[in-house]
Amino acid sequence: MKHETMTGHAPMNGVFDGTAYSVAGEGPALILIHGVGMNRSVWAPQVDALQLCFRVVSYDMLGHGASRLPAVSPALDEYAAQLAALLDHLQIDVAHVVGHSMGSLIALEFALHYPQRVTSVAALNAVYDRTPTQRAAVMQRAASLDDGGLEQPSIDATVARWFDDPVPGHLAQVAELVRSLLATVNPEGYARTYRLFASSDQAHVGRLPQLAMPALFMTGECDPNSSPAMSHSMAAAAPRGRAEIIANERHMMNVTAPAIVNQRLVQFIREASRA
């Protein structure tokens, strides 16, 4: 394999072993893992900016976009193994790994399973050790899913959670983009992945002290389900963890406040690279 710094790679799209991916830019490898119900296109504001400094790899997690389905009852390590296989295919030994929401669970699982392959890990809008009320709500949503796709009321409720209700006028366009992704997600893939997401908030409780690399836990001040308290708790548990809270933002801050999210990510990654 090759070192994380790669040069001479033109932007490209591909599919390997049922995983659809895109690569853009040159430099140290940086991996972007989207959340449940989305696909790699949701990272467009990050890819546009970060490809100037990094070799940015975004991909569709199992059950999403153009990637294959996960197992009927998947585990987090199945999603982590998907990323490991993709990095092998791309000849990337080590990388900075960034996840959002469900993607943060995968990023942390990957960092714990393959620490030698992770220079730094950033968990955006991550869930961790939900309160009983939070857990009951997400488990109820998971139990209501079937393989027939998201009904319009469910999509409306999700957009309201992620953007506020009503959606602020200046966010209407990006909210419609997110709504369209939810409406077209593979229904089986979404249901299988969401059930795992709903039940995995304690997957890293007691394990974060094993994170050897720099770890950033960043969320929005107004995100009720991936709360600032969760990010602070994770940062306190990780030996090299730190929390960043973005003022006035909610769950989809990578598309509602891309400039500040990108700036915080670049600052963190550069500091991690010097550590």
Label each residue range with its predicted role.
Residues 1-30, 51-55, 92-93, 202, ...:
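Alpha/beta-hydrolase fold catalytic core
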Residues 221-226:
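Acidic catalytic loop of the alpha/beta-hydrolase fold
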